[in-house]
Amino acid sequence: MYPAHLLVLLAVCVSLLGAASIPARPLNLYQFGNMIQCANHGRRPTRHYMDYGCYCGKGGSGTPVDELDRCCQTHDDCYGEAEKLPACNYMMSGPYYNTYSYECNDGELTCKDNNDECKAFICNCDRTAAICFARTPYNDANWNINTKTSC
C-alpha cells in the first residue's frame, strides 16, 4: 500500500470512531425539533427546550414551573396516550421513533392526511406542543434548573 492510501484509511477509521460516539437521536424528536423551529420562526434554538423546567426534556415529574413547562407536561402526557394506541404498539412504532408527514408554511404546521392512525396522533402531539411553545413566554431562569429541589 502507498503511504497516501494508509493516510486515507486512517482518516476513515478515525471518522468512524468519532461517529460511533455520537448518541443516536430518535427520528421523531428530530421532526419535533423542526416543528418547533417552524412554529417559532427560528427565534429560539430547539436545544433551549431540552432542559427547561420540570417536564421539557427527558422524563418529567412534580409541578410544572410555568406555562411553557405545562406545554411540555401536556406533550409528555400526549406521548403516553400514543403509547396506549394499538396502532402505536409494535416495535419501533411509538412516539419517539415513528416518523410522520407534515408541512410547515410560514409558521403554520399541518399534519398531512397520508399519516396512519399512530403517525397522525404523534404528529398532532408534536404540532400542539410546538404551537404552545411559540405562543408561551420563555423564562431563562427556568432553564437547566435543579429538578430535585424545584419540581
From Swiss-Prot:
The keyword Transmembrane does not apply. One of its GO terms (biological process) is lipid catabolic process. GO terms for molecular function: calcium ion binding; calcium-dependent phospholipase A2 activity; phospholipid binding; signaling receptor binding; toxin activity. Residues 1-27 form the signal peptide. CDD domains: PLA2c. One of its GO terms (cellular component) is extracellular region. It holds the Pfam family Phospholip_A2_1. Disulfide bonds join 38-104, 54-151, 56-72, 71-132, 78-125, 88-118, 111-123. PLA2 catalyzes the calcium-dependent hydrolysis of the 2-acyl groups in 3-sn-phosphoglycerides. This is Acidic phospholipase A2 4. The lineage of its organism: Eukaryota, Metazoa, Chordata, Craniata, Vertebrata.
